Each structure stands twice: as C-alpha cells, then as structure tokens.
Amino acid sequence: MHHHHPPLPITGASGSTAVGTGAAAAEDASPAANSGPAPISTSTTPSGSNSQQHQRRRKKRANYNYNGIRTVEVRRGYNGFGFTISGQQPCRLSCIISSSPAEQAGLRSGDFLISVNGLNVSKLPHETVVQLIGNSFGSIRMQIAENYYSDSSDEENAHATLRGQLLAASLRHKPRFLHHKAKLHRLRNSPQKKLNPPEAVEPHKSKSSPDHPTLKPVLEDPPLTANLSKAADVANVSAMVRAVGSAALECRVIVGYLGTIEMPKQISHSSKLQTVRSCIRKLRQEKRQPTIVLMCITPDSLSLQSSSGGVLATYSSARLNFVSSSSESENRFFGLVTSAVHNTQIEEEYEPSAGSAAAAGHISISHSCHVFVIDTKLIEHAQHLQRAHEFRLQCTRDPISNLCLEFPNNSEYVVNLVRSMYTMRILPPASRSHQADYEAGAGAAAAGGAVAAAHSPQPSNHSEISTTTSNSDSGIGFNNDCTNISDRILVVDFLAAGAGAAAAAHAGPPTYPAPARPLGIVGIPDNRLTVRAMPDHSALLRSPPASSSLRRPNLLASFNLIQSPATNLTSTRSCDDVLNLFVDDSPRTLAAVASMDDISLHSAAPSLDEGHTFAHPACVPRKMRRSLALETPTTPHKLSAQVFGQPGSRHSLGFEAIDSVQSSVSGACMDQTMDTWASLQNLHKSHKDRTSMSASSSSHCLLEATNSEPDLGNRALPANASPFRRAWGQSSFRTPRSDKVAKEQQQLGQSSPVRRTASMNASDNDMYIKTLMLDSDLKSSRSQHQLSLLQVPKVLTTPAPPSAITASVAAEGAAQDHGCPSSWAGSFERMLQDAAGMQTFSEFLKKEFSAENIYFWTACERYRLLESEADRVAQAREIFAKHLANNSSDPVNVDSQARSLTEEKLADAAPDIFAPAQKQIFSLMKFDSYQRFIRSDLYKSCVEAEQKNQPLPYSGLDLDELLKTNFHLGAFSKLKKSASNAEDRRRKSLLPWHRKTRSKSRDRTEIMADMQHALMPAPPVPQNAPLTSASLKLVCGQNSLSDLHSSRSSLSSFDAGTATGGQGASTESVYSLCRVILTDGATTIVQTRPGETVGELVERLLEKRNLVYPYYDIVFQGSTKSIDVQQPSQILAGKEVVIERRVAFKLDLPDPKVISVKSKPKKQLHEVIRPILSKYNYKMEQVQVIMRDTQVPIDLNQPVTMADGQRLRIVMVNSDFQVGGGSSMPPKQSKPMKPLPQGHLDELTNKVFNELLASKADAAASEKSRPVDLCSMKSNEAPSETSSLFERMRRQQRDGGNIPASKLPKLKKKSTSSSQQSEEAATTQAVADPKKPIIAKLKAGVKLQVTERVAEHQDELLEGLKRAQLARLEDQRGTEINFDLPDFLKNKENLSAAVSKLRKVRASLSPVSKVPATPTEIPQPAPRLSITRSQQPVSPMKVDQEPETDLPAATQDQTEFAKAPPPLPPKPKVLPIKPSNWGVAQPTGNYCNKYSPSKQVPTSPKEASKPGTFASKIPLDLGRKSLEEAGSRCAYLDEPSSSFV
C-alpha cells in the first residue's frame, strides 16, 4: 500500500492534485490563492487507503512513484526558465511564473525535481542544483516526480496501524497566512469532496454523543490500538520513553538568552550548522541585550530557569535536535535547535461521514533555534559571585582551569555538555515521546472534548512591517504563518516550584512523559501560551462529566490543535486571534492564556487540585468592584476587529496596555473565578508578595478588550500613517478606557490603573511616554500589598534578582525594602535611599578616605529642600566653606568651573546653586566608589548577613544626622542616573517585547518630572497627591502645544513616582534633551551637543535612522515658523520640534529671474505659483507653466510634489517681450521698442547731471553712505552679471518710501543661486574695506533693460540714470579721490553726444525696424551705450569668448540660461588700468561664476602688469546666445556698478 505525502507548496500558483495508486487524480482540487499554498485534495484508492498530506516528512532514501514521474523539456526564455526551486534532496518547484516556459511545459508548483539533463539531482544540495540549472543554455530536460515518498522506515511502520484505523474524510490544508481574507473566503467556500469509507475497514465507534465534534489525529503517526483506554497500552508505550524527573545527573550553567528564530520546515542535517550560525548572526546584528538565565541540563530534559527559580522553558531530551557554537573565532554564542510537533489542520468546518468518528489530521514538525551567549565578564569568581547568589548556585571549581564550571568562558563547554548528555543514546523521533499522551488523550477526543487551539505569534512578513531583522520573537505583528510553532522562552517569574509541582502532580500518572511542546513553556503540560486569550463558553457546555478512570492530561492543548464545528464563528479569525479552548472530562477552570508576546494575560485563579491552571504570580493590586458582571467569554470584542468590527465605545488595547478591572462573576457557565495577570514584564515580585497575592486571588477580574488590530481611530496617530506603522512600526500609543466601566469607575471615585507598556521594538531612541492613571486610594493599599507608590513595577532593567527588582520598584522607599543589601546592587539610588545602605556606603567611603563626597551630596540634598531663603543663604555659605572653598576643611573633587559657578551664585542662594558640583560628585560616587563598594568585602558581608537572617553590620538606625536626607518623592526623583554605565552593569531590554525602556542617559523618573515642568507648565499638583486622570487632563490642557499625549510623546517608560511632586527639581537634565517628531509620526528624544547647530542635530538623527529628507523645515511643535538651521542646537533644549518635509523646485520667471520655491507637500501647484506671480506682477491668465527641459506644459491642478526637484519655467502666453536664458519664444514675437522722444531724453540727462553734482559732495562727505551706496554690491552672494542700479532704487525706496512698490520696473535680476537671494542683502566686502578706490568697486557693466513699461515710469528711470552718471563720474576720476570735475565733463556737448548715442543704440537694438542714427565725431568719454553683437570682436578686453559647451559641467548647468554679450571695450586714456587680479570674488552658495580668475584673459601685458587692489570687478557676459534667440533689447552702460543680491 502506498501512502502519498506531497509537501505543501510554498507559493503555488496553481492547485496541485495528489496522485493515488491506480486512481485518477481528484478533479476538484481547491483553487489556490495567489500567494499561498495550493490546497490539495485527497483521493482514495479502491483498496481503501487514504492519502494523508504531510507538510514535512523525515527523508530517508529516495523512492519515487514511477507512475508519477514524467520527463519535460523546458526552453530558456528571455527571463529564464520561469520557475523557482526550494528545499533540497530533492528540490521542489515552489513557484511557476505564469506564461513562462515552465508553465507551458506543464510544470506545477509542488513537483519534485529528480534529474536534470540526465543527471540525478535528488540527492544533491540546493546550491548545486541551482548552479546546474543556471549554467544550462537553450533547453533543459528534467525528470519531475509529482509526489515524493520516503522509503519504509521504523517511523512509517509504526504509523501504519493508525492509518488503517483512520477513515478518510474531506480535509483540506488550512492556508498558511490566514490574514489574506480573500483567499480564506475562497477556501472556505470551495466545494468539498465527500468520500465514503471503505468497507474493509470497520468504522471506529465514537464514545461521545453525536453532538460533540470528532477528533482529528494529533501526533505524527503514533500506533493506535482498538481499545484506547487500556492502562497496559499506556504503560507499554510510556516505557519506551524516559520518565521525567528520573534524572540523577544535572549540569547547570549561567547563559544569556538572546532570542528564538523559527527555522525552515525542511532542514537537512547537513545544513543545520549553517542555519544555526545564520540565526546567531541575525540576532547579533540586532544587538540584543541578553537575558541571564540558568540552563539546567539533565538526561531527561533541558530547562531554563530565572533567578527566582521559575522555569522559563523546558525541552525534553527527545525534542533537542541540534546544538552548535557560532564559530571558532567567536565562541561566545551558541544555538540550540528544538523540534515541536503540531497539527496543520485549523478549525475548518467539516461534516463527519456516517459512522466516522475521527478524521485524519495533518502533522508536521517545526524547528526553533534558541540563541544563547556566554557572558565573558562573569568568568572570574569575584565578578559572578553576586550572580551566583541570585540563582542560588554553589560554584564548582574546575581543578584544571581553576574557573567555576557554572560560569563557562566560552560556548564550547556548554555545547559539549549538551552533546555528551543527549547524543550518547539513540533518541526516538520527536513524536515518539508522546504516544502515551496520545493514547491517553484520544479518549478525551472521542468523548468530544474541545481541543485547545494555540498558535505562536510569529513576526509578520508583511511588506510594511518586515525589516532586515530576524523572525525571532519580536513581540510585534501576529499576523502570519500560524503553523509555525515557536518554542518561545518566557521570562516570567511564576509561583514557587512547590506550588507548580503540586499543580502538575494532578496532570496525570507519573509515568506520563513530557509532551512535545515545552511543558506549556512553564512546566505544566496542559497549558499553552496563545496569541489571544479567549475562552469559549461552548467548550464548557460541551464538557461531559468525568468518565475515565485516568486523570489524563489534555494532550491536545499541548499539541496546539484547533477544532470546532462549522457553525463556530471563530474559524474565520485572523491568525493573531486564535483561541485557546481548554476543556477536560470535567468542568474545569478556563485557563486561557495569551502568548508571552501578547503581554495581556487572562488566567484562572490557581487551585492546587487542578491540573489546568498556571500558578498565579503576584499581580498589581486593583480596587475591588463588585457591581460589575463578568462578560460572556465569547464576546466579540475579544476577537479580531477584522472579523467582528470595532466594538462600540471601546478603544483597542493591544499588547501594550492592560486595563485591570475586578468584578464578580455572574455568567451561568462560569463557575470558577478568573483573574487578570499584569504585564509579563512586570511580574517581578518577591516570594512573599506572590504568597500574599495568591491568598487573595479569589477576587474576580475582568480583562478589557484586547483587540489585536491597531486603533486607527486614535487621534494621537497621524492620519496618513500606515496602519502597520501606526500599530506596530512604533510602540503603540493607546487611549485609556472610555467605556461604561471606566465611567462607573470614575463615579466611584476611583481611577483605573491603566498600565501602558510600550513595546520597544523600534530604535533605542523611539520611546513613548506611558500614561499612568493611578489609584487615588493608593496609600491605604500600599501597606496591604507592599507595592510601590504608583504600583507600576519597573520593566526588567537591572541584573538584580527579583528581590532586588522588587526593592527597586518601591519609589517612595517603603519600609520593607530598607536594610535589604541585595537591592543595593541593583541601583545606586536605591542604596542611598536605604538608611542602612547610606550608612554602610558612608563607612566604606571612610575607609577609602573619601567620605566627604557623601557628606557633601547629602548636605546639598538638604539644602535644596530648604524653604526659607535666609536658611538657604546661611547653609549655602556653610557648605561652600566646608567643601568648595580654597581653604575648606573637607574639600571635594569638583572642577574649577563648577566651583566658580557656585561661588558666583552664592549670594543669591538659589536652590540649585550646588547642582553642577553635586552632579559631579554624584557621578563620581556612582561610577567609581559605588562600583568598588559592590565588590567590597563589606558589601559581601552585608549580603551574607541578609541571607542568614543576621543583623547587618550597619543597620541605619544610628545614621549620622549629616547623612540624613528627605527621601520623599520629589527628592528621590532627582537621584541622578545620568550617563549610566548601563552597558556594563544593567541588562536593559533583554527580550524584544520590552525593548530598551529607559532613555539612554537619563533616568526615566527624572525625565518625566522635568518634561512635566519644562514642556507643560501647569498649576502645581499637590505634593503627595497621585496623578489621577483628572489632574493629568488638567496638566495637559494648560499647554496644548506641548501636549505629551496628542504628540505621541516619546519617552518610553517612566517611574510613575515622578508624576507627582517633583518639587525643587532641576530641569538641567531635560534641557539638554529635545523631542524630535519625524514626518511619519515617529518621535525621538535627542541630546543636544554644545557647538552643534540645529541642522547638524537633525542631520545626525536622520543619518542614524537612515532617512533621506532632501528638503525639510524644522518648526516648534504647535508653531508654524521654521527654525534657522544655523542656530545652535541648545535653543531646542527642553522643546518639542517637528521635522516637516518640503517640496523644492526652481522657477524661471519670464524675465531672467530664477526663484527657488519651497512648499508644503500637501498643496497644489497653482496654490504655490499664484502668490509668486502676484508678487512679481504677473497674472495667471497671461502665463503658462512649462517644464524647462522638455517644454511640456504643466497642469497646475496637480499636487506640488510632481515638481519636486524640477525646473519650471513661466512663459508669457501673448507677451510683448521675452527675455532670459533658454527662452523658447521666437524672436518674431518680440515687438520693436518705441524709442523715447528726444525731448524726454534731453530733459532726463540734464536733470541727472544737475542732481548728481549736488549729491557728490554729500556722498563724499558721508563716510558711511559711500560704502553702502557707492561701493560695489558685488559680493559673494550675488552673481556678477546683475546690475545694482535698481537695487539702489529699491534701497532708496525702502528707506525713503517715496516710490510705491507696485511702480518698480519689471527688471528682474538673474540669479544662479540655488535659492532666491534676499533683495535687501547688503554687501560685506565693500563695506569691510571702504578705503579701496571707489572706481575699482564700481567699474562694471550695467545692464539696463529699456522697455515700454520702463518708459512709463520716468521717475524710476531718472533715478537709475542719475546713479549711472554718478558712477560714470567716479569712473573718470581715476584711482585717486579728486572732487574737481574733469574739463571734458564741463563741456555741454558731451552730454548731447551721450543723448545722441543713446538714441542710436536704442534704434540699433531693435531687431525688426532699426532707427537710423548718425554717428558723432566728438570724442566719447561720456557713457557709451552702444553695443551690438557685431562689435564684439573689436573689444581689446575680450573675455575668453568660448562657446557655452566648453563650460565646465558644474558651471554650465547653472549659467547657460544667463549668458549675455560680453562687456564693452575700455574707454581710452582716462580708463584706470585693470590689474591682473581683477574680479577675485569667491562665489558662495550654489552660484558658479563663469569668470573666475583662471579664466580671465588680460587684454594686454601692460594692463596685466599694472598694480592695483581691485577686488570686485568681473566683466559680464549676459547671455549672448539667448539674447539673439529672444530678440531681446538690452542696453549696456559700460560703467561701474554694483550687483544685486
């Protein structure tokens, strides 16, 4: 009999069909989804064999069904053959591209590759097959097996019996990614083939009523006898397995746990080493902090324990698959591979055939790689002594290396331990150890017990979530492959081992072996940590009374199976809402427990006579509320919002929040009590806490809705954020409860203790503030529950044992934590808070002759809390004289700056005058003295005394008065943890679901208090009043601009104690921090650095995050004004700033003006361009916007983002003129310019001459006005080919205000800068050196555009001509300042000649109709305004007239549009000689000047050799080519001029 087990295709594109021996393939294969496995129908042979599909099989020897082998020939296409292969030995076709040669040849996803071109590849590695196919050209001939079978093996023979007794049923594989709703819908609605059972096999009778669902097989292939309840069968099978607890040998080592990564289903033995090392490499790249655990290696199992003795994970020896270190060079890391059995059949609806009571299931084995690291810092005995005490280890010396065996120095020792312990005997398959469990549990299945459903929360492979990180247990994104069972390691302190053992003792006879899963991951077989805790009331109702003599364990729970009738709505859940249904043969407590990634747990109260309960840890105290009824466990709000919709008036409380509410139980089916766990990270209570809480665990709790979907309606989230980013990309920020329960709670005068635990899966700086809603009656409950002031335990941030962590939680310094030396190692601040610790530490300092430090620090603490100013003055002088003065009696070691700062402020007696010195001393003690103290014999003696319950050497009762401080909340919050050496001494965020929860260099307590004061000035909260929701709203409402909640504030976790009080708190720490909100809503706390600009700070942040923002603005939160990026970053200290993306593009105006435009990305193009056109007096109707490069018109209704980084041009639709580089308008569209009447010109010229004589004396007399008005405006900010005539006009109009802005001529200046230069910018070069000859500064060509519009405004033209003549007079005067006019200027005929020349030039510049002009014979020292293209070669001062294509690339791009004719030749005789270094001006910004000194060609050796100090004269080339193309009319005054900015 052949049994066919084709593996499930990974990404099949078409449905594949199982082939049975002698039977036709089934015709109704379920259609496959586009991206998922193709469901495979089952066909039954006439002989009655059923085809079970197995996703993965152990492969032994290749054996093929030769009826299913075919030979195909595939030709290589343009893009290859069109198929992908996966796996190896043999490889499998995993994806067939549609319309590819592979599809045309008939290849199907799931087929196995047997041979290629006659070469058998069934046993070759994957890489070899890939190379063989990839190197083939033309066509390849392949042998394809439609099914792949293993040879008969022991494993298969053992399963044969079971197969013969299981009837065939129409079963389908469940989809691997249930969150594809369309695919799920198709799958659920696809037709199913009903098969009649073969007559040869007698139906197995069900022991349950027909109403109860039947059971699918659980294990891979355990043998099943007809009588399932025989104790002898159980004993026989269990005898094959080693009994748990029979180990006599045990090895224990301390290791660090990094994380778990799911491994491929099909992993061959040869690739295990490579796979393990890749897992190690991935986790190392994520730079995770290890969790220190105790690995106990026994012959039966390998377990991981926490420092409190709680079992974190247990793996039976049968499940340990492989162990290896990372490499020989880096031997600190090692990986442990475990296997787990699971059933791939999710609760699909099905109809039992007549007489059939069981259906074939789909069994598969998955592997998990757990990565560990050896802490080499703990090798020395003195270094790990404290850690050994935490784990209650007695160190065992190695006589050879003289090192402790419990703290190995490399991973090879642990690897060899594991190998030697488990490889000396032949281990059975992973499923073999569970046959007894199955035989015992099958009866329960036949009795109709509901099956426990559990799936591991895998990190999602969704494109918006997945990054380059591994798929290890990151605690985010539960929506992916349900079939992967991950052996997650849960770092939680459970109840003491005694209670757990007592609870487990009732799970079944001691002969029962451990199940395949880790014992519920916590040592109890019947519990599974599921993704969403959701009990099913139908499970309780279906549960029959106990009928079996055996108290059997709920095996199905540990095997993670799902089964429910077709009518159960829960079968349509997404993967992250899988239910956990616990039912046994008697009504049991519902013990639905969420997965460790979920953090919100829902468990039954512990009872030692029940086997289905977790031991209840200590939990956060809650107010009793008897008025509420427990909701029915199957209320839809506990399920996915995708299926049931968002519940009304409820907010999504995902795995970051717990709303713990206690109520009485009123449900008819709920006869057991329920309770709610606190967050898994926060169950760090001492044993006495757990005991006291267990006693009161009969109180009833109601778990708030735990929808896994992101709360997209939350106002705190940006509307444009991706749902995945908003839900999981950053730490979710949920809103507090707003349902009736919360309202009623407020009416009762209580506030729900909502814990918001941000999952720190983003970068270390991505931190969110937790909203802490605190109990108003906290003080009364403090002594009862022995909890901290704010009942929020710290996330595991210290390496201390749970007792120390418990102590570290008590922010107010409760009495039970005093005199506890083990807590001192966890925190320097905690030790100072403890009177015994203070006294012990001071005695230690006295032995080191540095006790003055602690005395100074405590004196400063007392001083800071003084109310009276007079007392402060006296106390300040006393402290200064004793510790800081030059002749002080007990001087402390502070730097001179802190000492001088204190001395300067001594008279003021401000509360914080000693803050700098105190901070230095505190850091000195914390990072120097305290470190030695922890390793000192004095501290060890204190710890030993504590462990032996002996009195401490220094009890603190007789503490020196000078060492006493007021450790109330306000004082304690200021115990600095600045610049903590967290990397060496703390484990900050060891598992990914509580990633780093403290700001790197600031204590969370300090930050929250300071942020309260710095960012949200508000009415003071009473000193000792808890921060209730009402007061929190009051605080937040005071300053909405800095609302910590609306802005999704980014401090990850705070000790709640700082929320109240905080009086006298110095804001020094927070003032070196600022919060930066990025465009995607992510927030970060960034430290400002002295000497760093705002721009550098933002660039540093963006670079760290690997973000590229080409253009952005930085604005204060709530403001619209952008911050200058050149300002020092200190202006951001204590502030909240937002980085806003901007769109930037360049805009060419019709006249040669280039504007750089920066806009918000949400605007449309016309909204951006219209104000610009209005500013420059253009109308939208008269212009058209085109792309400068392609000349394609642009639709202005498009978003402005389409122009990002582009170059746009504005062209006149019907213009009289078109000037500018790159003009696309033909010359014929430019009309000839009407020359001005002769009378106007004469009048203007005479007026100019009269006025400039009067202004000359003023200009010379005023030393200030000359550099501003007369000196060259050519500076580093302006290009040389621009005229300053109208810049001066604008300046005068700005100063005098006599010329309206609307009347300024449309003479747009060209600018090649990347950004629009300020028109009012003044020169720096000329002003800085007013003694240079004015002629040198002013000698330059002036471009004057004479248009009809200019002629209309004669006042402006007059002003321009007047300044031109002024410059002309300066030019004629030579390098020496001489106020006598030259004789030739006194000749009136010269002026008439100038006017005549002007007329001639204007006529000659008209390209259409030229007005003839008579040349004059008079000498021409006056302004020569004629230049045409034909005159260019005459110039003796010709400037390197190279074609524009010869320009350097960088220069050409920016100057090609601004080219113009070259300057005029120099004037004869009186012209000052230009020196060789003429025009040495350093361009700034993006301006590139064509005429650099290297390109300057001296006109003559004489001119080149003349000395001079001229710095800002650059000849102009104003767009020769473009001028001709546009037919533009320009007149060039060959006078000195200034360029605009």
From Swiss-Prot:
SUPFAM superfamilies: PDZ domain-like, PH domain-like, Regulator of G-protein signaling, RGS, Ubiquitin-like
Domain PDZ: 71-148
GO biological process: asymmetric neuroblast division; axon ensheathment in central nervous system; cortical actin cytoskeleton organization; dorsal/ventral axis specification, ovarian follicular epithelium; embryonic axis specification; establishment of glial blood-brain barrier; G protein-coupled receptor signaling pathway; glial cell differentiation
GO molecular function, one term: GDP-dissociation inhibitor activity
Principal location class: cytoplasm
UniProt xrefs under Pfam families: PDZ, RBD, RGS
PROSITE patterns linked to this entry: GOLOCO, PDZ, PID, RBD, RGS
Composition bias type Pro residues, residue spans: 1460-1469
Tissues and organs where the protein is expressed, per its UniProt entry: Expressed in surface and longitudinal glial cells, gut and heart (at protein level).
InterPro entries in alphabetical order: GoLoco_motif, PDZ, PDZ_sf, PH-like_dom_sf, PTB/PI_dom, RBD_dom, RGS, RGS10/12/14-like
Subcellular location: Cytoplasm; Cell membrane; Apical cell membrane
GO cellular component terms attached to this protein's record: apical cortex; apical plasma membrane; cytoplasm; nucleus; plasma membrane
Membrane-spanning residues: none
Residue ranges of domain PID in the record: 247-423
Compositionally biased intervals (Basic and acidic residues): 201-214
Occurrences of domain RBD (ranges): 1072-1142, 1143-1213
Region of interest (Disordered), ranges: 1-66, 182-222, 449-473, 708-761, 978-1004, 1258-1327, 1410-1513
UniProt key word Cell membrane: yes
Keywords: Cell cycle, Cell division, Cell membrane, Cytoplasm, Developmental protein, Differentiation, GTPase activation, Membrane, Oogenesis, Repeat
Biased composition (Polar residues): 40-53, 457-473, 744-761, 1273-1285, 1483-1499
Chain intervals with Basic residues compositional bias: 987-999
PANTHER family noted in UniProt: REGULATOR OF G-PROTEIN SIGNALING LOCO
Protein function: Acts as a regulator of G protein signaling (RGS). Modulates G protein alpha subunits nucleotide exchange and hydrolysis activities by functioning either as a GTPase-activating protein (GAP), thereby driving G protein alpha subunits into their inactive GDP-bound form, or as a GDP-dissociation inhibitor (GDI). Confers GDI and GAP activities on G(i) alpha subunit Galphai. Confers GAP activity on G(o)-alpha subunit Galphao and G(i) alpha subunit Galphai. Involved in the dorsal-ventral axis formation of the egg.
Quaternary organization: Interacts (via GoLoco and RGS domains) with Galphai (via GDP- or GTP-bound forms).
Protein name: Regulator of G-protein signaling loco
The organism of origin for this protein: Drosophila melanogaster (Fruit fly)
Native organism taxonomy: Eukaryota, Metazoa, Ecdysozoa, Arthropoda, Hexapoda
Chain's gene name: loco
